[in-house]
Amino acid sequence: VGVDNTRASIGMNIKPGQTVMTGEGAEAVYVIGPDAFLQREKTKITFEDSAGAQAMRIVTGSVLSVFGKGREKARKLQLTTPTATIGIRGTGCYIEAEEARTYFCLCYGEAEAVPTGDPKQKETIRTTHHEHPIYILATGGKMMAPATVINHTDAELTMLENVVGRWPPFHGQGGSRY
């Protein structure tokens, strides 16, 4: 696991403009402010901050993320993949970014998914427990297609929320489905 060209270490701060990379067989859990991330193997993510908006560019790979809400005012958070731009608010989500498509599961919260190939096909999504996973495609007539829940669990979401002192909204509502 590396941050820019430096081997990552426990307690290392990640700042806007930096890139976090994981190699084969590596995973990383890290916290930036009220947000926590589980970055899977072979993933490259850059964090940016411009004009008061925070951005996370998933260049390639997979990441499970939980985002806290702003205290004083609404936070502007934007996720970018090769095929989509996703605006998020108080959200837990899982992304697998590839060149031709992005898998996006809004585990809970609210997001606006905008396909890069046709921004007019944007969709606002609201979920409480994995109800609307989608693929966002790079090309084609219909840019978003239904998907199923893959490669992430409620236990992982709970762990990430606990790392930042919270519980996921589905906590205490019966058994886990994922």
Protein language model features and the residues they cover:
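Flexible, surface-exposed loop/linker segments and immediately adjacent secondary-structure boundaries
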Residues: V1-Y178
